[in-house]
Protein backbone atom coordinates (compact mmCIF):
# COMPACT_ATOMS: atom_id res chain seq x y z
CA UNK A 1 0.00 0.00 0.00
CA UNK A 2 1.37 3.40 -0.96
CA UNK A 3 1.53 6.29 1.50
CA UNK A 4 -1.12 8.11 -0.55
CA UNK A 5 -3.45 5.10 -0.28
CA UNK A 6 -2.84 4.96 3.47
CA UNK A 7 -3.51 8.65 4.14
CA UNK A 8 -6.34 9.35 1.67
CA UNK A 9 -9.19 7.54 3.48
CA UNK A 10 -8.16 8.99 6.84
CA UNK A 11 -8.12 12.55 5.49
CA UNK A 12 -11.38 12.01 3.58
CA UNK A 13 -12.97 10.69 6.77
CA UNK A 14 -12.18 14.03 8.40
CA UNK A 15 -13.96 15.92 5.59
CA UNK A 16 -10.91 16.94 3.56
CA UNK A 17 -9.31 15.93 0.28
CA UNK A 18 -5.74 14.69 -0.01
CA UNK A 19 -4.30 16.64 -2.95
CA UNK A 20 -0.67 15.57 -2.93
CA UNK A 21 2.21 14.22 -0.87
CA UNK A 22 5.87 15.20 -1.16
CA UNK A 23 8.69 13.33 0.54
CA UNK A 24 12.28 14.41 0.77
CA UNK A 25 14.98 11.84 1.48
CA UNK A 26 13.48 8.86 3.34
CA UNK A 27 12.85 9.61 6.98
CA UNK A 28 13.17 13.38 6.62
CA UNK A 29 10.38 15.74 5.59
CA UNK A 30 6.85 14.65 4.73
CA UNK A 31 4.59 17.32 3.18
CA UNK A 32 0.86 16.71 2.92
CA UNK A 33 -1.35 19.04 0.88
CA UNK A 34 -5.06 19.12 1.72
CA UNK A 35 -8.12 20.91 0.41
CA UNK A 36 -11.84 21.05 1.11
CA UNK A 37 -14.80 21.59 -1.17
CA UNK A 38 -16.13 24.70 0.57
CA UNK A 39 -13.99 27.53 1.85
CA UNK A 40 -10.27 27.80 2.40
CA UNK A 41 -7.93 25.68 4.46
CA UNK A 42 -7.22 27.30 7.82
CA UNK A 43 -4.42 26.84 10.33
CA UNK A 44 -6.85 24.93 12.56
CA UNK A 45 -7.55 22.52 9.67
CA UNK A 46 -3.82 21.90 9.22
CA UNK A 47 -3.29 21.35 12.96
CA UNK A 48 -6.18 18.87 13.17
CA UNK A 49 -4.90 16.86 10.19
CA UNK A 50 -1.31 17.02 11.46
CA UNK A 51 -2.27 15.68 14.90
CA UNK A 52 -4.32 12.87 13.40
CA UNK A 53 -1.67 11.90 10.84
CA UNK A 54 1.10 11.95 13.46
CA UNK A 55 -0.75 9.23 15.36
CA UNK A 56 -1.52 7.22 12.21
CA UNK A 57 2.08 7.39 10.97
CA UNK A 58 3.36 6.25 14.39
CA UNK A 59 0.96 3.28 14.42
CA UNK A 60 1.94 2.35 10.85
CA UNK A 61 5.65 2.75 11.73
CA UNK A 62 6.29 5.31 8.95
CA UNK A 63 9.65 6.98 9.52
CA UNK A 64 9.82 10.78 9.18
CA UNK A 65 11.45 13.65 11.08
CA UNK A 66 9.05 16.45 10.24
CA UNK A 67 5.45 16.57 9.03
CA UNK A 68 4.07 19.64 7.24
CA UNK A 69 0.38 19.97 6.40
CA UNK A 70 -0.79 22.85 4.20
CA UNK A 71 -3.18 23.92 1.49
CA UNK A 72 -2.13 23.29 -2.11
CA UNK A 73 -2.04 27.05 -2.78
CA UNK A 74 -3.71 29.13 -5.46
CA UNK A 75 -1.82 27.27 -8.21
CA UNK A 76 -3.23 23.96 -7.01
CA UNK A 77 -2.01 20.84 -8.79
CA UNK A 78 -4.61 18.88 -10.75
CA UNK A 79 -3.98 15.17 -10.30
CA UNK A 80 -7.23 13.23 -10.54
CA UNK A 81 -10.06 13.24 -13.07
CA UNK A 82 -12.29 14.72 -10.35
CA UNK A 83 -9.90 17.69 -10.06
CA UNK A 84 -10.39 18.57 -13.72
CA UNK A 85 -14.17 18.22 -13.40
CA UNK A 86 -14.22 20.41 -10.27
CA UNK A 87 -12.21 23.20 -11.90
CA UNK A 88 -13.93 23.16 -15.30
CA UNK A 89 -13.86 26.63 -16.85
CA UNK A 90 -10.66 27.60 -15.01
CA UNK A 91 -7.28 28.29 -16.61
CA UNK A 92 -4.49 25.75 -16.21
CA UNK A 93 -0.87 25.17 -17.16
CA UNK A 94 -0.41 21.66 -18.59
CA UNK A 95 2.76 19.65 -19.27
CA UNK A 96 2.50 16.43 -21.29
CA UNK A 97 4.62 13.29 -21.15
CA UNK A 98 4.44 12.89 -24.93
CA UNK A 99 4.21 15.90 -27.27
CA UNK A 100 0.92 16.77 -28.93
CA UNK A 101 1.25 18.63 -32.23
CA UNK A 102 4.99 18.98 -31.52
CA UNK A 103 4.41 20.66 -28.16
CA UNK A 104 4.49 19.48 -24.52
CA UNK A 105 3.49 22.66 -22.66
CA UNK A 106 0.07 24.28 -22.95
CA UNK A 107 -1.89 27.00 -21.21
CA UNK A 108 -5.64 27.07 -21.63
CA UNK A 109 -9.12 26.75 -20.21
CA UNK A 110 -10.44 23.41 -18.96
CA UNK A 111 -13.48 22.71 -21.15
CA UNK A 112 -14.58 19.14 -20.30
CA UNK A 113 -13.48 15.64 -19.33
CA UNK A 114 -15.03 12.59 -20.98
CA UNK A 115 -13.77 9.01 -20.88
CA UNK A 116 -10.40 10.06 -19.40
CA UNK A 117 -9.85 12.66 -22.15
CA UNK A 118 -9.47 16.33 -21.23
CA UNK A 119 -10.60 19.02 -23.66
CA UNK A 120 -8.45 22.14 -23.29
CA UNK A 121 -9.10 25.43 -25.08
CA UNK A 122 -5.60 26.71 -25.84
CA UNK A 123 -5.59 29.96 -27.83
CA UNK A 124 -8.95 29.16 -29.40
CA UNK A 125 -7.96 25.61 -30.39
CA UNK A 126 -9.72 22.70 -28.71
CA UNK A 127 -7.16 20.04 -27.80
CA UNK A 128 -8.04 16.49 -26.79
CA UNK A 129 -5.54 15.28 -24.18
CA UNK A 130 -5.57 11.83 -22.60
CA UNK A 131 -5.30 12.15 -18.83
CA UNK A 132 -2.64 9.43 -18.76
CA UNK A 133 -0.45 11.68 -20.97
CA UNK A 134 -0.43 14.44 -18.34
CA UNK A 135 2.90 14.89 -16.61
CA UNK A 136 1.90 17.95 -14.62
CA UNK A 137 -1.14 20.22 -14.43
CA UNK A 138 -1.69 23.29 -12.25
CA UNK A 139 -4.38 25.91 -11.96
CA UNK A 140 -3.43 29.43 -12.96
CA UNK A 141 -4.59 31.71 -10.13
CA UNK A 142 -6.89 34.62 -10.87
CA UNK A 143 -5.30 37.68 -9.32
Curated annotation (Swiss-Prot):
It is found in: Cytoplasm. Keywords: Cytoplasm, Ribosome biogenesis. One of its GO terms (biological process) is ribosomal small subunit assembly. GO terms for cellular component: cytosol. SUPFAM superfamilies: YhbC-like, C-terminal domain, YhbC-like, N-terminal domain. Required for maturation of 30S ribosomal subunits. This is Ribosome maturation factor RimP. InterPro entries: Ribosome_maturation_RimP, RimP_C, RimP_C_sf, RimP_N, RimP_N_sf. The keyword Kinase does not apply. It comes from Nitrosomonas europaea (strain ATCC 19718 / CIP 103999 / KCTC 2705 / NBRC 14298). Its main location: cytoplasm. Belongs to the RimP family.
